[in-house]
Amino acid sequence: NKVYHNNNLVWQKQFFIYNNGVIGNNGNIWVHWSAYPNNYEFNKNENGKLIARGGYGDTQLKIISGGYNVSGYSMLHVVGNYELNIANYGEDWFGLSSVANDYNPNICNQYMKIGDTAKSFHLQIPFSFNGTAYFNWRFLTFHKMYISQIYVV
């Protein structure tokens, strides 16, 4: 899954679990986001919805990674880095904070502020967890965004 050249990593397999509105063939991710006063959800059957939120306040994007069998238990087992790419439209800046460590203390808080020239960014999370990983992203003061891809490397 990795290729080295002169001891330098030059390529490694990327395991997409969400890519431009298409869930990876494993189909084991469920994404939920909510914006006051309404709550919205999209899963593998409702991909690529805009995350629209105007004005001030929090919008939360919750990513639950892991397959669920008929009994409702997670089948996730991933060790590696977890990356989230998000596109931003029409807003000068927005904040993104991860409070994933509320659910898994091995994952640290991360926060990022994007200037008005930035159209997208990715956030890489050190990730080593066996079970259900519940990420709670808080988006602050943005207008329109959408998830472009989520993948494990």
Which residues make up each language-model segment?
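Extracellular carbohydrate recognition and processing domains
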Residues: 101-130
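Extracellular carbohydrate-recognition regions
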Residues: 2, 8-39
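Extra-cytoplasmic beta-strand recognition segments
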Residues: 19-22, 50, 64-88, 125
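Beta-strand acidic-aromatic groove motif in beta-rich domains, primarily in extracellular
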Residues: 85-99
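Short beta-strand-plus-loop segments that form exposed binding edges in beta-rich domains
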Residues: 136-143
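Extracellular beta-strand elements of beta-rich domains used
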Residues: 145-152
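Short carbohydrate-recognition loop motifs
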Residues: 40-58
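Secreted extracellular polysaccharide-interacting domains
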Residues: 54-71, 91-93, 103-107
